């Protein structure tokens, strides 16, 4: 943040994961906070849109750019996002509670490393605890497994998780991040026998989700 200030550049933060409910970037000194309204804001995966919150210092510049580009959100999307925002706090707290229970279950398995800040010693916990007031439903699993087909079977055998790239809606989703490129695997610090699976924990009963994951884990060999 200080380095960016010295370079006289704008400091921008993508706040989609925690939303402003759990993280307030402008109060931390950021110039802009971007959120994909397609996700938690709407909450039903039926909207295309985004939001941009800015500091007073850059407001006039952003307003001028907005007038030039003429970007506008459609009335139907605006209505659905506004409706979703009314229940954002209730939904996010449920996502967090469900995710903590799922994370606690998954932490038992030595072949799975959780990429989720749910307790002391977990991934990025110190930084998360310093700036965030809560965690959302998106998490990553580093699965240690020599056979990639076993990972695919694990993903495909999940019955309560839809397969999809987006997230932030009411439903639970899974995505197998098949990184075959050497550079990408290096970025995620994946060993040859490690595979990345992304889970979004939705609003379903957490005991049902855990039972579903448990039956799917038997495919990991």
Please report, for each region that a protein language model flagged, where it lies by residue.
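Short, well-ordered beta-strand elements within core beta-sheets of diverse protein domains
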Residues: 81-90, 137-145, 197-202
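Short acidic loop-to-helix transition motifs that present clustered carboxylates
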Residues: 16-20
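Single conserved hydrophobic/aromatic residue that forms the stacking wall/gate
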Residues: 1-12
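Conserved small-domain helix->loop->beta segment predominantly found in fold-type I
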Residues: 100-159, 163-168, 184-188
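PLP-dependent enzyme catalytic core of the Aspartate aminotransferase-like
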Residues: 145-149, 157, 172, 176-221
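General beta-strand structural signal in soluble alpha/beta enzymes
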Residues: 13-15, 33-36, 75, 114-116, ...
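Active-site PLP attachment segment
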Residues: 26-80, 84-88
